[in-house]
């Protein structure tokens, strides 16, 4: 099951990609969960920074090739549908985002 765990350490929100069996490889579900988690964390006025990290022995191994069929034949359209909302949420985040690799 795709997931992103959420935590806080003082004013720092901590988001952890939690698919260690695939080295946190990106899937549409994981991307959606990440975008949702970014939105939830940044809606909290007490959060002044975000740290994004990965569970297990790797931060993120890239695109999960087994899930690539969800992108369909139109690769650009697939990227826009699944990746762009999450990238946009990170880019427009009101607080600094630090990636702990």
Feature map (PLM): residue ranges:
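Conserved CoA-thioester-binding segment of acyl-CoA-metabolizing enzymes
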Residues: 1-55
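Hydrophobic pocket-lining residues within nucleotide cofactor-binding pockets
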Residues: 26, 65, 101
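Hydrophobic beta-strand anchors of alpha/beta hydrolase catalytic cores
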Residues: 50-51, 59, 98
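Glycine- (often His-adjacent) and acidic-residue-rich active-site loop
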Residues: 39, 54-89
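A short, structure-level motif marking secondary-structure boundaries and short turns
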Residues: 22-23, 70-72, 97
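Glycine-rich beta-to-alpha active-site loop
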Residues: 86-101
């Amino acid at each position: 099951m795709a997931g992103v765990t959420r935590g806080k350490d003082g004013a720092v929100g901590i988001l952890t990609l939690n698919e260690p069996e695939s080295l946190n490889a990106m899937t549409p579900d994981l991307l959606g969960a990440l975008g949702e988690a970014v939105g939830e964390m940044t809606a909290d006025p007490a959060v002044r920074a975000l740290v994004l990290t990965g569970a297990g022995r790797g931060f993120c191994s890239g695109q999960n090739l087994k899930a690539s069929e969800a992108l369909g034949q139109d690769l650009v359209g697939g990227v826009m549908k699944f990746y762009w909302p999450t990238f946009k949420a990170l880019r427009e985040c009101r607080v600094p985002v630090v990636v702990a690799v």
